[in-house]
């Protein structure tokens, strides 16, 4: 089907229902009131304000401003105008005057930024109203990105549907009582815009035509890519699309051991590539760190290829570019962000392509704090550099519906080379993975996400978010200091500590004079939100607990609010005598209707986006203080966690919150769980790759496997990707042997098996390892590949 050209709507979009007009006027001025009446008669809501004091960041739904500059208000009007433009809004602004003349107007500060002047009495209110309404409508049109705008226009045409989906505008639902509830809850628009590709007005989402491809082109321009592809089933699919477009069976892939399971599945199981694993850091709080800096060394990487048992041709280690693809988590779940420029200097010449998995970021292209940390903003990419992919989970911290993802492709600098993957071949991989029945509102959310980041607006949105994150960390640091001095004993001298430096030094900054050993919370917010040195993981610093870094190599993400719970000494990384496992606090917060993103051993993660405001963050702080008060009086567990207690009444009868934390902390300490977790991602613990991951998965499909208790898996080949979720990072990979090197991995899972039995109600999700209840206890089982007596795989 050939789509029609992108067209203007045949039915006017009802901007009068979507935007309002704000009038900052003297309510006693009859001519001004007549102007307002004329605008209201044209269907627009008009909000009257008496002055210019409102926070313009809350005015995203304003279609035009009318502002009086009489009566000494000219200076305030100028400040207001600057505030609107500074946050990136291009909202029409009309200056309303009566006695001021042309010579009174400041051409530089005023006339250059306003859309027009209203002189009451010179033209009729009806005429001025038409001008203002017209400017609001035109502004509304300018806000509509290609696909979303086309979808609104299509909806306005009220086409009669005899195609998919079967609910046909929601009318099927309205035929039944349950369906009526469903229809009314979501509202008619979502159903009317759940469209079918049988009508080509909106273009083809799979072969990229019409408004669909225009939306993706606009996103590419805004994010800095050569091409962008919208993906509607998550970054798990985006990663598989890239992996299967680039990799063949037997290709070498440089593989971050922190990679999400989707890259194991796409690159290793589906494509059949051979991984060269990169060791990664964990700190004692259970947080995910970066690849060891030393692991990027070319000599180390070539040696690993030579030593790999699945690489039969050892000369591959000598190839100019031995790696077809590198797969790297640009930002870890816990907020470690790589300096992309530094990593590219180390491995760029060794790889045909680099895939940067940006599932947990995506805003790094829009704020100067992240300079050097965005692959789409790298400069001077030459023909000797690798092609770049970024995969982004727009739904995680962007403005996208759940499962909204996108792939950015930046490789025109290698166009014409044999390693180049042109669009047509790339799209064949995309077609293998995406649905032929896309959900149009989901696609539109990706279109709008790009639009809201266009121009200055993207930076301003994230600037405010970063600022709020800084302020809440400063507030929390104040509580830390308070309780350290006011607590009656060590078990009360604590509070939830934000994961930022205690003290920092800054030198040669464009944003600050030199600082020496200054408390982080004492540094001005305007400096903190601009200066990378305030967020870097210094190699020698103790506060972060990571090892193996280089100067400037990584920084902490300001939009990941991570709070540490007691139990670990930040200076030494060793267990303390008492502790509060983060899972207890996470369960408490959920009881209080505050939902954290995740928890690990002794850390809580809260995602920050431009959606945040003071009310949410102050409520979070209040709930944390409430938990501290419950802790200090050692409240009954039934009061702190009523749901967990009710489900496990017999187990926790008579328990207080301190008692359950004491037992759980002692268990984790005695089992050495933090050290087991760290070892799972170190080179010395990587098991023997007995067979390729793809071969192990084929054994699982063919049922050439045994289902055994994990304690009996020693020496056997794993047939599954085993992991704890979150964060969904593979601990042992299909094809790896549960050998002696893998003992930390086995002991890590067995520690969780025991914790599930000891502490019901505080379980984590496990995948690739399965929970069976035997004789009243949970026991972990897993699938292992069936081998013949001579070590060959059964067929």
What positions do the PLM features span?
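Non-catalytic terminal extensions of PLP-dependent enzymes
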Residues: 2-19, 40-43, 53-65, 75-78, ...
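Conserved acidic segment of CheY-like receiver
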Residues: 9-30, 35-40, 44-48, 268
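Conserved hydrophobic helix-helix packing surfaces used for dimerization/oligomerization
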Residues: 19-22, 228, 253, 326
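Structural motif
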Residues: 23-30, 50-51, 66-71, 96-100, ...
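Short, charged/polar "capping" segments at the starts of alpha-helices
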Residues: 28-35, 74, 100-106, 262-263
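Conserved PLP-enzyme active-site core in the AAT-like
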Residues: 47-52, 57, 78-90, 105-107, ...
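Conserved acidic residues
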Residues: 60-66, 114-118, 226, 251, ...
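Long, structured ligand/cofactor-binding scaffold of large enzymes
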Residues: 177-270, 276
């Amino acid at each position: 089907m050939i789509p029609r050209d992108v067209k203007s709507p045949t039915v006017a979009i009802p901007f009068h229902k979507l935007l309002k007009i704000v009038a900052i006027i003297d309510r006693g001025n009859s001519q001004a009131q007549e102007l307002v009446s004329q605008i209201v008669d044209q269907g627009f809501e008009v909000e009257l304000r008496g002055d210019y004091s409102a926070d313009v960041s809350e005015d995203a739904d304003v279609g035009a401003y009318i502002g009086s500059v009489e009566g000494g208000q000219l200076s305030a009007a100028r400040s207001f105008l600057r505030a609107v433009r500074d946050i990136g809004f291009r909202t029409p602004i009309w200056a309303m005057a009566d006695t001021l003349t042309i010579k009174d107007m400041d051409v530089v500060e005023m006339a250059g930024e306003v859309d027009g002047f209203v002189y009451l009495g010179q033209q009729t209110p009806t005429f001025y109203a038409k001008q203002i309404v017209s400017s609001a409508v035109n502004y509304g049109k300018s806000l509509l990105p290609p696909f979303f705008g086309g979808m609104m226009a299509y909806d306005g045409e009220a086409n009669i549907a005899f195609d998919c989906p079967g609910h046909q505008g929601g009318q099927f639902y309205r035929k039944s009582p349950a369906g009526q509830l469903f229809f009314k809850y979501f509202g008619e628009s979502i159903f009317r815009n759940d469209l079918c590709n049988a009508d080509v007005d909106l273009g083809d989402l799979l072969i990229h035509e019409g408004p669909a491809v225009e939306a993706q082109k606009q996103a590419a321009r805004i994010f800095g890519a050569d091409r962008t592809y919208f993906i509607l089933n998550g970054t798990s699919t985006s990663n598989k699309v890239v992996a299967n477009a680039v990799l063949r069976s037997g290709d070498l892939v440089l593989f971050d051991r922190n990679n999400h399971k989707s890259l194991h599945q796409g690159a290793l199981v589906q494509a059949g590539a051979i991984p060269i694993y990169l060791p990664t850091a964990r700190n004692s709080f259970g947080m995910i760190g970066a690849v060891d800096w030393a692991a990027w060394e070319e000599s180390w990487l070539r040696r690993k290829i030579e030593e790999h048992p699945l690489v039969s041709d050892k000369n591959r280690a000598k190839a100019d570019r031995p790696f077809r693809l590198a797969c790297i988590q640009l930002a870890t779940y816990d907020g470690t962000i790589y300096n992309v420029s530094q990593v590219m200097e180390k491995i760029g010449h060794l790889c045909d392509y680099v895939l940067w998995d940006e599932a947990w970021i995506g805003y790094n292209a829009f704020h100067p704090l992240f300079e050097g940390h965005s692959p789409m903003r790298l400069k001077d990419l030459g023909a000797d550099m690798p092609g770049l992919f970024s995969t982004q989970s727009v739904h995680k911290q962007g403005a996208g519906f759940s499962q909204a993802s996108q792939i950015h492709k930046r490789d025109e600098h290698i166009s014409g080379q044999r390693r180049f993957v042109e669009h047509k071949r790339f799209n064949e991989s995309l077609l293998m993975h995406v649905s032929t029945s896309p959900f149009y509102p989901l696609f539109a959310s990706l279109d709008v996400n790009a639009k809201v980041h266009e121009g200055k607006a993207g930076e301003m949105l994230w600037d405010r978010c970063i600022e709020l994150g800084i302020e809440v960390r400063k507030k929390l640091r104040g509580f830390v200091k308070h309780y350290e001095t006011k607590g009656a004993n060590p078990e009360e001298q604590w509070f939830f500590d934000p994961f930022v430096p205690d003290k920092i030094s800054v030198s040669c900054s464009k944003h600050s004079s030199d600082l020496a050993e200054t408390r982080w919370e004492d540094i001005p917010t305007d400096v903190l939100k601009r200066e990378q040195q305030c967020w870097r993981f210094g190699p020698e610093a103790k506060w972060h607990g990571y090892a193996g870094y280089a100067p400037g190599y990584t920084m902490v993400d300001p939009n990941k609010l991570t709070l540490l719970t007691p139990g670990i000494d930040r200076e030494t990384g060793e267990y303390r005598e008492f502790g509060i496992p983060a899972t207890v606090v996470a369960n408490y917060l959920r009881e209080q209707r505050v939902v954290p993103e995740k928890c690990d051993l002794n850390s809580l993660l809260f995602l920050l986006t431009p959606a945040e405001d003071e009310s949410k963050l102050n409520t979070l702080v209040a709930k944390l203080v409430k938990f501290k008060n419950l802790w200090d009086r050692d409240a009954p567990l039934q009061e702190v966690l009523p749901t967990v207690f009710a489900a496990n009444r017999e187990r926790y009868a008579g328990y207080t919150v301190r008692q359950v934390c004491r037992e759980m902390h002692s268990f984790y300490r005695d089992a050495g769980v933090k050290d087991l977790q760290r070892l799972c991602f170190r080179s010395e613990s990587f098991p023997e790759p007995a067979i390729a991951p793809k071969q192990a998965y084929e054994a699982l499909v063919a049922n050439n496997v045994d289902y055994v208790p994990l304690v009996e898996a020693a020496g056997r080949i794993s047939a599954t990707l085993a992991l704890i979720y979150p964060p969904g990072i593979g601990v042992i990979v299909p094809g790896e042997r549960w050998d002696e090197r893998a003992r930390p991995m086995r002991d890590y899972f067995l520690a969780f098996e025991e914790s599930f039995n000891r502490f019901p109600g505080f379980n984590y999700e496990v995948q690739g390892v399965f929970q069976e209840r035997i004789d009243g206890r949970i026991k972990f089982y897993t699938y292992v590949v069936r081998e013949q007596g001579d070590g060959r795989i059964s067929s």
